[in-house]
């Protein structure tokens, strides 16, 4: 992730664009970098807690993250084309998927709250927080992508 970020930043600094555009692109690059960092943090925590298999409820959260990622990727691929409205639709899909992710998070947390195994509750809560943070960062990146589209019009 660091190498990709460095390459992208070098391209950005050498591009002939307005400062506003450069700021928007920089924001997206740093947000993508923060997503990679959040994923790394999730993996570090899962490894530290020796977690190899997660509760079934996590599958729904991972699916929501995948939906966010696919919609964001699709939006970026359409950036700079004549499909601005599709990019806006993709960014809304990211926000909708994140909202659904938060709902899944609450359902799992409510179920965990009924458990007497505090170590299990703590571990799963920490992992869930990391996943929710990844989703939040994806949503922030989608908002910045939408900002770029609006500035391009």
Name every feature range the model reports, one short phrase each.
Residues 2-153:
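Cytosolic, long alpha-helical scaffolding segments
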